[in-house]
Amino acid sequence: MMTDNRNTILAVILSGLVLIAWQYFYNVPAMEKQRAQQQAQAELQKTTPQPTASATPGATPQSGGAAQPSTPAAGQQAQPVVARDAAIAASPRVKIDTPRIAGSISLKGGRIDDVALVQYRETVDPKSPPIVLYSPSGTAEPYYAEFGWVPATGVTAKLPDAQTLWQQDGSGSLTPTTPAVLKWDNGEGLTFRRTISVDDHYLFTIKDEVSNVGNAPVTLYPFALISRHGTPQVSGYYILHEGLIGYLDGLQEYAYKKIDEAKSVNFKATNGWLGMTDKYWASALLPDTSAQLQARFSSNPVGNVHTYQTDYLLDPVTVAIGGSATANARLFAGAKEAGVVGINFPLAGHGGYNKELNLNHFDLLIDWGWFYFITKPMFLGLDFFYRFFGNFGISILLVTVIVKLLFFPLANKSYASMAKMKSIQPQLQALKERYPDDKVKQQQEMMEIYRKEKINPVAGCLPVVIQIPVFFSLYKVLFVTIEMRQAPFYGWIKDLSAPDPTNLFNLFGLIPLDPTTIPVFGHYLALGIWPIIMGITMWFQMKLNPTPPDPTQQMIFNWMPLIFTFMLAGFPAGLVIYWAWNNTLSVLQQSFIMRRNGVKVELFDNLKATFARKAT
């Protein structure tokens, strides 16, 4: 077999092994795990009452000077699960009305516990319900943020807690132009005032004030927490982090299972942030950048249900008689949009909250992965073209062209070397005939020919090898960025981040059957139109080189496009479109370079030979 064919086969097999490993360690386990979690969660919601949590964090301050508070108890108690609407109606509320958020603030406890993201729907159907981020205590999956004060050790003053009923100062909804003001008097000389503001995106600003008209000073610790009841379903498996996250003297990531084992982890940091992240959505506490934090990640089991919490305490403040104190906090609760969160990358132009608030690596809320140096610029390129064409599918096609142009010098050298390999095939064949039984002599003479002709025998692997990190980086962009979620292409592709919805095995919808639901093998039966197109383009790419004489190698060449077609069938449609388009460009590029080097392009001759053999 010709050396360029051997190199191509080697590169293809390498890619295939990577894809097989990817399928085995990610796709199939993730699907099985997700199904199991869905079943377990459904049973759990039927049989297990859900807890409500108190508003007190469990971190114990270690600052010097002031008396220390005792560690607050979890204070959780079980109660029956109620419908979300019923739980919302059970307490007086202040409505939240912004271009991106709809919901309410509970006056009982002063919690932000009702947040829906109105610009995002559960499915591609625009009439489907909006994504619900926060839900009140007592529902199936409580998730909320709370702010307040913790007393120092020895302080017995009554402070607002989860049961406190605040009063709204004034009336009306919380909007980007009208903050909500809450107030409460403990009847013992302390009055509390909370001003909550919200911007046009996903940022809440909370200003807590306490005034002391009593007969003794009090020392208090400002706190903030995010609490989430029940273990969420995770979709990323190993490809992205879902769980507790923060930047606390370095990036801290704890998956739910990991924090279940650790129970509680404490941190000290300045200019930090912390919260919980899902694939597309997140909730994060953003203290003042100059604040000294005593932060904590924790998991507290009540029966079979775990309550996950991220919280922090600030340095204590002493409120003198006749004096007052203020604590400021910020809360991000929304979609992980790159332009809103921010991208820390040269010339990115997406400062977002990361730059606006001078936060410490808040862009890491989006998991760009190990190949971030490729993933970030790839996303920026896709986003750039999207702003012009309004379609991420077109952006993928154009970015692929840009990538091809960037790597053209290397590909040109590689394909030129392959073209030279074709030109010396008669010499290599003569060597085999001259030294039929002396493989060592064959190799020595062959390497001498390579040296004389300045040919790199492994150059044919480079185009495919280079494509692998680009492939995974694009997969990462499609998988983790909210911008790609439910982004349509043309025709039947309504979501580039999901597999092609058509399926050959049910005759593209004519038969009422979903083959992908078949256990274990269902993922490989998601054979839509675009995977078939990708397989055809790969088959053309393989036919660009002559068929190798060895029967085993012929079989590899013939079966590889079909194998890749099935392996890529369950991948996001955007990735399959990229692969098909990249194959097409590779065929055109290789043909151009071969012609320029005076080598005949044998694509059509090889196709004719293939069909001629089948005809006979």
Swiss-Prot record:
Q: Which InterPro entries match?
A: Membr_insert_YidC, Membr_insert_YidC_N, YidC/ALB3/OXA1/COX18, YidC/Oxa/ALB_C, YidC_ALB_C, YidC_periplasmic_sf
Matches recorded under PANTHER family:
CYTOCHROME C OXIDASE ASSEMBLY PROTEIN COX18, MITOCHONDRIAL, OXA1
- Subunit text: Interacts with the Sec translocase complex via SecD. Specifically interacts with transmembrane segments of nascent integral membrane proteins during membrane integration.
Q: Does the keyword Iron-sulfur apply?
A: no
List the cysteine pairs that form cystine.
Answer: none
User: Topologically, how does it sit relative to the membrane?
Assistant: Multi-pass membrane protein
List membrane-spanning regions: 9-29, 388-408, 462-482, 520-540, 559-579
Keywords, comma-separated and alphabetical? Cell inner membrane, Cell membrane, Chaperone, Membrane, Protein transport, Transmembrane, Transmembrane helix, Transport
GO terms for MF:
membrane insertase activity
**Function of the molecule:** Required for the insertion and/or proper folding and/or complex formation of integral membrane proteins into the membrane. Involved in integration of membrane proteins that insert both dependently and independently of the Sec translocase complex, as well as at least some lipoproteins. Aids folding of multispanning membrane proteins.
Chain intervals with Polar residues compositional bias: 44-71
Q: Which GO terms describe its cellular component?
A: plasma membrane
Where is the region Disordered? 37-80
Q: Where in the cell is it found?
A: Cell inner membrane
Instruction: Supply the source organism for this entry.
Output: Bradyrhizobium diazoefficiens (strain JCM 10833 / BCRC 13528 / IAM 13628 / NBRC 14792 / USDA 110)
Name of the protein this chain belongs to: Membrane protein insertase YidC
Tell me the Gene Ontology biological-process terms attached to this UniProt entry: protein insertion into membrane; protein transport
Q: Which family does it belong to?
A: Belongs to the OXA1/ALB3/YidC family. Type 1 subfamily.
